[in-house]
Design a protein with these regions (language model features):
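Conserved non-catalytic scaffold segment of RNase H-like nuclease domains
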Residues: 6-142, 157-179
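Active-site catalytic microenvironments for nucleophilic, acid-base chemistry
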Residues: 131-134, 153, 170, 191-198
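Conserved beta-strand -> loop -> alpha-helix junction used to position metal-binding or nucleic-acid-contacting
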Residues: 138-152
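Residues on a specific face of well-ordered alpha-helices
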Residues: 149, 162-166, 186-190
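Conserved phosphate/pyrophosphate-binding and hydrolysis machinery centered on Walker-type P-loop NTPases
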Residues: 181-185
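GIY-YIG nuclease catalytic motif and its immediate N-terminal context
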Residues: 186-239
Length: 239
């Protein structure tokens, strides 16, 4: 949260009163935010040496899907066998697919000015930024939200790890992550809704505060989270 200071002259000299404004005073209500949840499949783990094989994205507002974007991408290189085993994407599936040169501008248009969300989003953005740099496009400059970082803050004690499959199960996502881009993007969206519900319980109702939440140590929100971390996680009587 941010502290706003007002100075008042009460006769004996100026007095500064600091107060914490409500979330509604601070920015865009989450109910008005458009999120674009993104997932990429690639030939490997490094954007410096590997290529994109599939793009999946879906736009949401207030939990409703507004549109989806999905395409295989011809990486221009042979797919490593372990990638085919992991994703089910074969060389035959991508050989007739468009190249990233055709996909990237369409994806940028689809994302628009939405808040970009992903699970370990830095990985996906590293590939998009590498492609943009190579093709002469600006890097993605939208506001971003990583569900890994948000889950680490809000639900880490409740789950065995922060993998997408674990969190999707925790929040009862009807879409099972399967290393295909659009399904993984939609599963990430269900994780996001679960995390937004938790954040709402801490009083977070505006986008700006949500974006600060993963790193907002020392804030009122953080103190609430720290207190919540001390509470038992299972029903029953605790002495």
């Amino acid at each position: 949260g941010r502290c706003i200071e007002h100075m008042f002259d009460v006769g004996s000299g100026p007095v500064t009163i600091a107060y914490q404004p409500s979330f509604d005073d601070l920015g865009m209500p989450l109910s008005e935010v458009t999120f674009c949840v993104l997932d990429l499949e690639t030939t490997g783990g490094s954007a410096a040496t590997c290529e994109i094989t599939e793009v999946g994205a879906a736009r949401y507002r207030m939990g409703e899907e507004l549109g989806a974007f999905q395409t295989l991408v011809n990486p221009g290189v042979a797919l490593p066998p372990f990638i085919t085993v992991l994703t089910g994407i074969t060389q035959a599936m991508v050989v007739e697919a468009p190249r990233i040169e055709a996909v990237l501008p369409a994806l940028i248009e689809f994302i628009g000015d939405a808040v970009v969300v992903g699970h370990n989003l830095r990985f996906d953005l590293s590939f998009l930024d590498a492609a943009a740099r190579r093709l002469g496009y600006p890097k993605v400059s939208n506001r971003t939200l990583d569900t890994v970082a948000l889950a680490r803050r809000l639900v880490r004690p409740e789950v065995r790890n922060l993998k997408l499959s674990t969190l999707a199960g925790h929040f009862r996502s009807p879409v099972t992550p399967n290393h295909r881009a659009l399904d993984d993007a939609r599963a990430t969206a269900y994780v996001l809704w679960g995390l937004l519900e938790r954040a709402g319980g801490l009083g977070v109702t505006a986008l700006e505060d949500l974006l600060q939440l993963p790193t907002a140590r020392g804030s009122a929100h953080y103190r609430k989270i720290a207190l919540a971390d001390d509470l038992p996680r299972r029903p029953g009587v605790y002495m």
